[in-house]
Amino acid sequence: MLGLKGCLTILIGYVIAVCALFSSRGRNPSLTDWEKLKDQKISNIDNFGLTGQHLLEFFQENLPFLSFSEEKYRHKHVSLYYDVFKEYILRRASSKKCLPVDSAIAKLNKDVNPMPVHSHNDYWRKLPLFEGLAYGASSTEADVWNIDEKILAVGHNEAYLDPVELTLDKLYTGPLLEILDEVNCQDSDADRKNGVFFNSPETSLFFYIDFKSDDNELTYKLLMEQYFKSLIDSGYLTYYDMKKDEIIWRPVTVILTGNYPTSLDILDNGNDNGYFESSQRFAFLDAPLLSLEPKYSKLSVAATVSFSQLMKHCGSDHWKVSLRGRMDSNEISCAKSIIDGAHALKLKTRIWGAPTWPANLVETISRQIIHDLGSDLLNLDNLFMASSLI
């Protein structure tokens, strides 16, 4: 028989084993875990079992181990992080196997609920498009420049464009088409399309296209005939049905902003029945929130204003709000009445240019914009902060 000392030794060993087992459960794979996979290539791994913010953190922490054995990552396209992440996310999208539950969207945001947040300056993120989707941001944007009358490059400043790798098709429309094809492979119903959010496939992603070049007519032509054509042909873009006089919602809703064309003659390509003569208009205008007219209920799905313009309209100043640390009751009442007017036209609203520093001011104003004013899209650069405010 075992003595007291022997029993204690066995008991202690058992406790240590149990503690080790439970400590490994519920945690994300670590660098130590990946040391066991040094000889494996990321191209041999289909699913890490992580989504959303946890997936982003995992890739950032383990990037060296995820890419060091892959020769193709020696020459970057966007960045090492982006290239490796995109390779992992879109791997199954190129296969012929139809399995939406193991799709890119499942990897990105399974168990992540869509949030009413606009991914401001999304193209500046380390993972354009993908980071916003991983957080569940229901709106994104891309600034586009017309290069050589045939390429739409994405970027904020014309001096720092890359018309080879940082283009609208490579960063946005191409990946969108791939991931939407994955989750719509089983459904032949033309009137039913699954979107980019696993937990809410009926939610449409607002996609703002900010026109930067002077020739907005040519930019629009490139959008319709080149960059959005495959998404249109696949039934993935929201459109205004001219015959039924109603908006038909689809997985992606394109909103034109910035220096966009406003003439219906341009928007409909000189036709009475739409750009492609299908009685459909596939792009909506970013309506001016401070000067709305009834016509925008058909031309738009959202209205926008800057925070400074809104405060000025309400007889105040954004600096006063910043110094005070919050909007007062008069400012809230005025701004809310304007947003209510947009809602009466069935338009969503977005307020951009709110204070970005310090953090406590950003949080206070953001909460007021969403909860007190009733605005629909929180316009923030920091998606982590945004997720905690909704």
Curated annotation (Swiss-Prot):
UniProt xrefs under SUPFAM superfamilies: PLC-like phosphodiesterases
GO molecular function, one term: phosphoric diester hydrolase activity
Domain of life: Eukaryota
Entry-linked CDD domains: PI-PLCc_GDPD_SF_unchar3 (cd08577)
BP terms from Gene Ontology: lipid metabolic process
Presence of keyword Signal: yes
Disruption phenotype: Impairs respiratory growth.
Keywords: Signal
UniProt keyword annotation of rRNA-binding present: no
Signal peptide start and end residues: 1-17
Similarity section: Belongs to the AIM6 family.
Name under which the protein is recorded: Altered inheritance of mitochondria protein 6
Species name: Saccharomyces cerevisiae (strain ATCC 204508 / S288c)
Gene for this chain: AIM6
